[in-house]
Structures are given as structure tokens and as C-alpha cells.
Swiss-Prot record:
Gene that this polypeptide is encoded by: TK
GO terms classed as biological process: DNA biosynthetic process; TMP biosynthetic process
Catalytic-site annotation from UniProt: E48
EC number, as in UniProt: 2.7.1.21
Leader peptide range in chain numbering: none
Functional summary from the UniProt entry: Catalyzes the transfer of the gamma-phospho group of ATP to thymidine to generate dTMP in the salvage pathway of pyrimidine synthesis. The dTMP serves as a substrate for DNA polymerase during viral DNA replication. Allows the virus to be reactivated and to grow in non-proliferative cells lacking a high concentration of phosphorylated nucleic acid precursors.
Protein name listed in UniProt: Thymidine kinase
Length: 341
């Protein structure tokens, strides 16, 4: 494998398509790739590490996490043991994404000066099907909110995130609830089940994620922390039953993930977050603050979504990468995908 990273500096757009499962992200990403296929070596698509999830040291994370909920409902496992098993299987989703993300980060030119302009073509595009925060933030929080995981599992996932390199463009994909339920029921991945409360919570959490990133551009997490009520069962039920979180141009802290993270288990007797978890909250905030957030509707055809994504490109934050590093990245991605085919 080549190790030359000193070639010509290039402008690169790192784009991460994310959102709830089963809405058509992968199809939209493939359509976007097809759109740019006329320009060789222009775009690199990084797919979900599905086969790693299917066989991680002999364990199937997808069947395991959904199967655990079925076993709990059938009374085959206690609620407490089900929460522990869910936390275990959720952790299996994290490692393939995290390792790949670390390799990508190491290849980036993190200097903030002299950014290569990407408003003049050609420039490179790295399009990833999900960002690691899907498995470390959004899905674990959603599992907790429906009772599938205990709060004890959250700090190790949410508060230990690595620093995010410059130029992360996070595109949260959305569809209407009827379209979502129709699509996820049709794709029928082995072991995957449709749980309406979980789907509803996940949709709310992704809107909270966007609100959180916007909020952190001008605020700190502790601004308004004391005004938040503890995340209680009433709030959890509301998140499970309706799309109660709205996308805000100017979010308040109550519109963000911090409204979920105000947990008695993380706080002292007066509601102040314990020092260790406060440091973790800073780590989480720094990671999210550095991202550029976008929203993309997948309600219409994949072709329409690809065109809409293209219109967002001029608004995105570029990064630098050498041509040698780009070639290394292609080799890495091809090696992983060859091993997962």
C-alpha cells in the first residue's frame, strides 16, 4: 500500500449521510455516486460496514440487538439482562465505524489556513453512509429512551468521542413517517424488526442532533442546563408517541440532546452534573460543534435526492487532503469493501 501523502494539496468535501434506519440513505448515496461517475476518481463512496456488523468475532450485532428485544418481550430474558445485552450489541456497531473514521482523520490535512477552494470544479468528494455518531450517540440514546438500555451504558459511548477533523459535513436525511414505515418494512434485513416507538424516538433524536449542532455554534452546553428538567418518563413517552421535536433556526437547550442527557444518574443531589460527566459533556460538545449540519429530504425519488444533495455542495465546509492521501484512502476503502463482499 502506498504511503506517500506529500503530493499536491486538493480540496475535499467529506459528506456523511445519516438519519434513521430504512429511509433510503444508501440508495440516495448510490444515485449520487452514479451522478458523478462520468468524472473518474472524483468521488469515493464509503458504505456501511454491514458484514463486520454481521460477523464480529462470530457475533451478529443486528440480529443480536433486535433479537434481544424479542426475547425480552417473550419473557425469555429479564429486563435488566436485556439492557446489558443491548448495550453489548450496540457497542459492536461502534468499532468498525470508529476505526475507519480514525484512519480517515489521520489522512486529512488539518491545517485551517490556505484551504483549497472547492467552489471551482473539479474537487474530490468523500461520501460516507453514516457518521460514527450514529452508533455512539443517536442509536444508543434512542435505545435508552425506549427502555432498551440503562443510562449506565451512555457515558462510555457519548463522552469518549475523538476530536473531529475539520470539514465534517453531516447531512441528516428525512422522510415522512408513512414513507419511513413503508420503506423500512419492505427492506427486510435479516433479524431487523420494526418497533414504532423506537422509530419515532430515533426520528426525534436526529432532529435534536441537528438542533444541538446549531445551538453549540453560539452557546455552551451549560448555558441553560439549570433550566432543564430531568429527562423523565413523561418526556420519554412523548418522544415515543409523536414527532414532538421540531427543527429550529435558533434552538433553545430544550430542543437539543441535552434535554435527554439531563439524567439524575449523571447529576448530584442539586441537579448539577458530576465533574467527570461534565468533562465528557465538553468532549461531546466539541465534537458536534465542529460539524456543518444539513437536512436532506428523501421523500421523492433517489434521483431527486441526489440532485438536491448536489445543490448543497457550495454551502459545505471543505477540507484539505493531498493527492497521495486520497489514493491511500481509496486503497483502504477498497480493501474493507473487498473483505465485506
Amino acid at each position: 500500500m502506498s504511503t506517500d501523502k506529500t503530493d499536491v494539496k486538493m480540496g475535499v468535501l467529506r459528506i456523511y449521510l445519516d438519519g434513521a434506519y430504512g429511509i433510503g440513505k444508501t440508495t440516495a448515496a448510490e444515485e449520487f455516486l452514479h451522478h458523478f461517475a462520468i468524472t473518474p476518481n472524483r468521488i469515493l463512496l464509503i458504505g456501511e460496514p454491514l458484514s463486520y456488523w454481521r460477523n464480529l468475532a462470530g457475533e451478529d450485532a443486528i440480529c443480536g440487538i433486535y433479537g434481544t428485544q424479542t426475547r425480552r418481550l417473550n419473557g425469555d430474558v429479564s429486563p435488566e439482562d436485556a439492557q446489558r445485552l443491548t448495550a453489548h450489541f450496540q457497542s459492536l456497531f461502534c468499532s468498525p465505524h470508529a476505526i475507519m473514521h480514525a484512519k480517515i482523520s489521520a489522512l486529512m490535512d488539518t491545517s485551517t489556513s490556505d484551504l483549497v477552494q472547492v467552489n471551482k470544479e473539479p474537487y474530490k468528494i468523500m461520501l460516507s453512509d453514516r457518521h460514527p455518531i450514529a452508533s455512539t450517540i443517536c442509536f444508543p440514546l434512542s435505545r435508552y429512551l425506549v427502555g432498551d438500555m440503562s443510562p449506565a451504558a451512555l457515558p462510555g459511548l457519548l463522552f469518549t468521542l475523538p476530536a473531529e477533523p475539520p470539514g465534517t459535513n453531516l447531512v441528516v436525511c428525512t422522510v415522512s413517517l408513512p414513507s419511513h414505515l413503508s420503506r423500512v418494512s419492505k427492506r427486510a434485513r435479516p433479524g431487523e424488526t420494526v418497533n414504532l416507538p423506537f422509530v419515532m424516538v430515533l426520528r426525534n433524536v436526529y432532529i435534536m442532533l441537528i438542533n444541538t449542532i446549531i445551538f453549540l455554534k453560539t452557546n455552551n452546553w451549560h448555558a441553560g442546563w439549570n433550566t432543564l428538567s430531568f429527562c423523565n418518563d413523561v418526556f420519554k413517552q412523548k418522544l415515543q408517541k409523536s414527532e414532538c421535536i421540531k427543527l429550529r433556526e435558533v434552538p433553545g437547550i430544550e430542543d437539543t440532546l441535552f434535554a435527554v442527557l439531563k439524567l439524575p444518574e449523571l447529576c448530584g443531589e442539586f441537579g448539577n452534573i458530576l465533574p467527570l460527566w461534565a468533562w465528557g459533556m465538553e468532549t461531546l460538545s466539541n465534537c458536534l460543534r465542529s460539524m456543518s449540519p444539513f437536512v436532506l429530504s428523501l421523500e421523492q425519488t433517489p434521483q431527486h435526492a441526489a440532485q438536491e444533495l448536489k445543490t448543497l455542495l457550495p454551502q459545505m465546509t471543505p477540507a484539505n487532503m493531498s493527492s497521495g492521501a486520497w489514493n491511500i484512502l481509496k486503497e483502504l476503502v477498497n480493501a474493507v469493501q473487498d473483505n465485506t463482499s
